[in-house]
Amino acid sequence: MSDLKAAALRALKLMDLTTLNDDDTDAKVISLCHDAKTAVGNTAAICIYPRFIPIAKKTLREQGTPEVRIATVTNFPHGNDDIDIAVAETKAAVAYGADEVDVVFPYRALMAGDEKVGFELVKQCKEACGDILLKVIIETGELKEEALIKKASQICIEAGADFIKTSTGKVPVNATPEYARMMLEVIRDMGVAETVGFKPAGGVRTAEDAAAYLAMADEILGDNWVDARHYRFGASSLLTNLLNTLEVSDDVADPTAY
């Protein structure tokens, strides 16, 4: 197997296959669940709006892939600084049956100099999650500056985040290798690689993209760090490219170019 094919297979099994569109329907989510099951293995998870969790759970069970995890989003996509709303949404997501919650960090508050609200929001959302994985989206493409990206990452980790995630996919600039490196370096420098994972999201569209991100993680955190507990790709259109690279002809619906 070529290096690119090996990376493609690795990336496929780390995907949070995503549809987060205003026009999502039960039918689109059912199709997404079908896409998560491929001839070369399953994606790690699907990522959907909370209201679709019951239909997704049913579909995944019926198609024989109950191990595909269901991630959902809260405080999404704007990252407002109302802690009570973020916590209420997170509790509701857990009640719906989410396996993982991707919450948006109040990044604008941090840009305005408020570090406390982000810490408290993440801390309380993690308490609401219990054992359920909490991924925190810091919106790197809006923070832009290395100091802010690293500070947001540190706050999230100190507050109990299980993952730090680049982006919502809803702003002009999403994951970039530059931003990914900053966040991976924080995980390394804080000595939390055993407990904290990383998720680039938005803009990872090809096997070559994914291979470069994985090589960076191997370089910074070691060859044995990347696994589904420590690394995910938030993407939709990536799956078709990975399957093409692997020369597998699955008929994949493309919910967006996320």
Curated annotation (Swiss-Prot):
Keywords noted in UniProt: Cytoplasm, Lyase, Schiff base
Family to which this protein belongs: Belongs to the DeoC/FbaB aldolase family. DeoC type 2 subfamily.
CDD domains per the UniProt record, alphabetical: DeoC
Family matches, as SMART domains: DeoC
GO terms under biological process: 2-deoxyribose 1-phosphate catabolic process; carbohydrate catabolic process; deoxyribonucleotide catabolic process
Protein's recorded name: Deoxyribose-phosphate aldolase
PANTHER family: DEOXYRIBOSE-PHOSPHATE ALDOLASE
Gene3D superfamilies linked to this entry: Aldolase class I
The organism of origin for this protein: Vibrio parahaemolyticus serotype O3:K6 (strain RIMD 2210633)
Alphabetized InterPro entries for the sequence: Aldolase_TIM, DeoC, DeoC/FbaB/LacD_aldolase, DeoC_typeII
Keyword Ribosomal protein: no
EC code(s) of this entry: 4.1.2.4
The reaction(s) this protein catalyses: 2-deoxy-D-ribose 5-phosphate = D-glyceraldehyde 3-phosphate + acetaldehyde
Active site location: 102 (proton donor/acceptor), 165 (schiff-base intermediate with acetaldehyde), 199 (proton donor/acceptor)
A GO term from the CC aspect: cytoplasm
A GO molecular-function descriptor: deoxyribose-phosphate aldolase activity
Function per UniProt: Catalyzes a reversible aldol reaction between acetaldehyde and D-glyceraldehyde 3-phosphate to generate 2-deoxy-D-ribose 5-phosphate.
Top-level EC class: lyase
Subcellular location: Cytoplasm
Pathway: Carbohydrate degradation; 2-deoxy-D-ribose 1-phosphate degradation; D-glyceraldehyde 3-phosphate and acetaldehyde from 2-deoxy-alpha-D-ribose 1-phosphate: step 2/2
